[in-house]
Amino acid sequence: MKNHPYRDMTAAMVRTGILGFGGGPSVIPLIRHEAVNKYKWIDDDEFGEILAIANALPGPIATKMAAYLGFKLKGTLGAIVAILAHILPTCLAMVGLFAAVNVLSHSAIVAGMIGAVTPVIAVMLGIMAYEFGQKALKGFGWVTGILFFIIAFIGLQTLQINPGLVIIIFLAYGAFHFKLKDKITNKHSKDKGMSAS
């Protein structure tokens, strides 16, 4: 089976763009399905890293993720194609339906469609959150992982701290934590080697 990166990338980004009802939160699991599960361009760990960085930077998350995937696959041109494939269909649809926006905004049919698709989006986000939660607990252990969940929840929900700032703090801690862990492991290995000799 031949690999068609531009065709696959364009099809994937068009699908995520037109099916992402509700903005960023609903698009994230769709992009994950295309990039991780279907085409296997990246793994879950890399997806989590992209998501964290995209959240920390200004602008729409989905567009930044599309740009990253396009750049990874086909460089600068790939990034441009991925962004255009993601945003153009909905932009064109919006322009085409502009005359009917006022009518559609109060339409019972549109309200019903959004109401029906919301539980599906919630389930997709829940599955993704569960899988990322498992990875977090595996990486840091149950005690540290649960503590991080609590701190993040308090920071985001109770204290209303900017999500980008919370992500930057946790990224910085993660880098420090694993660097320290590697240093301790290397020192322990050296000590064992010296005692053995």
Curated annotation (Swiss-Prot):
Q: What is its main location?
A: membrane
Q: Which UniProt keywords apply?
A: Cell membrane, Membrane, Transmembrane, Transmembrane helix, Transport
Q: One of this protein's Pfam families, by short name?
A: Chromate_transp
What GO molecular function annotation could you give as one example from this UniProt entry? chromate transmembrane transporter activity
- By its UniProt entry, which InterPro entries does this protein fall under? CHR_Transporter (IPR052518), Chromate_transpt (IPR003370)
**Species assigned in the record:** Bacillus subtilis (strain 168)
TM ranges: 11-31, 50-70, 79-99, 108-128, 136-156, 158-178
Its placement in the membrane is given as:
Multi-pass membrane protein
Record protein name field: Uncharacterized transporter YwrB
Record localization: Cell membrane
Q: Does the keyword Ion transport apply?
A: no
